[in-house]
Amino acid sequence: MLEIGFCTLEDQCPYLKDKRSRIEYKYIENCSKEINNELIKRGWRRFGRYFSRPICKDCDECLSLRILVNEYNFSRSERRVINKNINTKVILRTPNLSNEHLFLYDKYHRFMEEKKNWKRYDLSFKQYYNLYVDGFMNFGYELAFYIEDKLVCVDLIDILEDGISSIYCFYDPDFSYFSLGKFSLLNEIQIAKKMNLDYIYLGYFVKKCQSLSYKADYTPNEILKGTKELFENEVLWEK
């Protein structure tokens, strides 16, 4: 298993305007499910064959958060979202790349640029492949959502030994009635329950960032305490 580690220089934080960020990376050519799981438990995130985590000098606002699946009960509003999507077709498959995917990705980010002032980058086929398709091995999948044969949402996930790592989701803003972002996460929870998995790893919760603060609304959940190196001691998560 080839592994190469490196770090970025300090740059503007993408989440908090008054902060600087620095990212540590691991490039892992043929990552096993076990290693992936151990890294995710320690606060890393996977995009393609790259794993990353923040190592910012004067900030610890990025908190890894995971949902406790076995204790999770769907609220009345969440059941309404599920019922609204009774005719939405959901396909679990290995990550795909098509014109549909790239068009939907671009449409979603144009919408978020206007709504939340996100920085938008034009993504090529190769860049999308490197970020969301490459390195899926025996754990990477996408949930593809179709309404009347139209691809309206893509949710990229890793199905690991103890849970599901939620990587990235994008959807068609013209179908906002269906609450597709929320519906995709509820699907992850349903799948985890059926597979007897314990956690949904939601990535980073940042209290002062609107785009990431919503994650704390999914309870019960746990926050990772401190950082540990791979296979170093026991990892501590707390409610």
From Swiss-Prot:
Catalytic activity as recorded in UniProt: N-terminal L-glutamyl-[protein] + L-leucyl-tRNA(Leu) = N-terminal L-leucyl-L-glutamyl-[protein] + tRNA(Leu) + H(+); N-terminal L-aspartyl-[protein] + L-leucyl-tRNA(Leu) = N-terminal L-leucyl-L-aspartyl-[protein] + tRNA(Leu) + H(+)
EC number: 2.3.2.29
Record's keyword terms, sorted: Acyltransferase, Cytoplasm, Transferase
Source species of the chain: Campylobacter jejuni subsp. jejuni serotype O:6 (strain 81116 / NCTC 11828)
Biological-process GO terms, alphabetical: ubiquitin-dependent protein catabolic process via the N-end rule pathway
Family per similarity comment: Belongs to the R-transferase family. Bpt subfamily.
Subcellular location: Cytoplasm
GO CC terms, sorted: cytoplasm
Protein name in UniProt: Aspartate/glutamate leucyltransferase
Function, in words: Functions in the N-end rule pathway of protein degradation where it conjugates Leu from its aminoacyl-tRNA to the N-termini of proteins containing an N-terminal aspartate or glutamate.
GO molecular function: arginyl-tRNA--protein transferase activity; leucyl-tRNA--protein transferase activity
Family matches, as Pfam families: ATE_C, ATE_N
